[in-house]
From Swiss-Prot:
GO terms for cellular component: cytoplasm. GO terms for biological process: innate immune response; regulation of apoptotic process. The central region was initially thought to constitute a DED (death effector) domain. However, 3D-structure data reveal a previously uncharacterized fold that is different from the predicted fold of a DED (death effector) domain. It consists of a large, hydrophobic central cavity that is poised for cofactor binding. Keywords: Immunity, Innate immunity. Belongs to the TNFAIP8 family. TNFAIP8L2 subfamily. InterPro entries: TNFAIP8-like (IPR008477), TNFAIP8_sf (IPR038355). This is Tumor necrosis factor, alpha-induced protein 8-like protein 2 B.
Amino acid sequence: METFSSKDMALKAQKKILSKMATKSMVQMIIDDTSSEILDELYRVSKEYTGNRSEAQKVVKDLIKVVVKIGVLFRHNRFNEEELKLAQNFQKKLRQGAMTAISFHEVDFTFDKTVMSDILTESRDMLLKLVNTHLTTKSHGRINHVFNHYADPELLTQLYNSSGPLKPHLNKICNGLNKLLENGTL
């Protein structure tokens, strides 16, 4: 007997539509102003680092799509108890990453590219495990693309170079992360 669920079909349709329409302007209602500012700075970092506008747009677009899809899954209660625990651990890892990024920024000569890269890699692995049965391999590829890009030790080294061109972007990213931590969003 075939099992059909209109709820599942609606969720699939919503994810499909969101994957086609997940642009910054459409996602404004899902992503707050502070997060949007951080995304803008991440775009600028990627654009300056790669020298490739379309690659920078793709990385940030992939990030937005993943955030929106996970938001849809969460709002539709698609995660079981084990996955919800994993989601909490992922959130803790993100908080740890944000606090580490801020600490490295605020305290001179403390930056360690291996620590930052490892946190991002562990976060990627946790997220892939969380969405393993919920998202397509294409979405898994997006997750890998985003995390592998920002976990690149050379990018991180340039980002934390106190006299480098990416420093102003790091200032704004860390200010935004501080806001998200203070208001409990992250």
